[in-house]
Amino acid sequence: MKQGIHPEYKEITATCSCGNIIKTKSTLCENIHIDVCSSCHPFYTGKQKVLDTGGRIDRFKKRFGGRMGRSS
């Protein structure tokens, strides 16, 4: 490797809005604030919900009803 051409690679802390602090390494070289992490993200906590904006799921079920999965 050539000397002097690579960016600095330092340890930083990523602080989540839930209070969790994650130590990692980055070339950013400054501490960052994140909105969600694996401790509070619904996918990882098991509290995942389907958000139906505008009734799209109901509209789909009304339009296609029980036709899905049947072979003609």
From Swiss-Prot:
Entry's Gene Ontology BP terms: translation
Alphabetized UniProt keyword annotations: Metal-binding, Ribonucleoprotein, Ribosomal protein, RNA-binding, rRNA-binding, Zinc
Any one Gene Ontology cellular component term annotated for this protein: ribosome
Needed cofactors: Zn(2+)
Cofactor: binding details: Binds 1 zinc ion per subunit.
Binding site for Zn(2+): 16, 18, 37, 40
Domain of life: Bacteria
Disulfide pairings: none
Keyword check for Metal-binding: yes
GO molecular function, one term: metal ion binding
Cited InterPro entries: Ribosomal_bL28/bL31-like_sf, Ribosomal_bL31, Ribosomal_bL31_A, Ribosomal_bL31_sf
SUPFAM superfamilies in UniProt: L28p-like
Subunit structure of this chain's protein: Part of the 50S ribosomal subunit.
Family matches, as NCBIfam families: L31, PRK00019.1, PRK00528.1
Family of this protein: Belongs to the bacterial ribosomal protein bL31 family. Type A subfamily.
Function recorded in the entry: Binds the 23S rRNA.
Protein known as: Large ribosomal subunit protein bL31
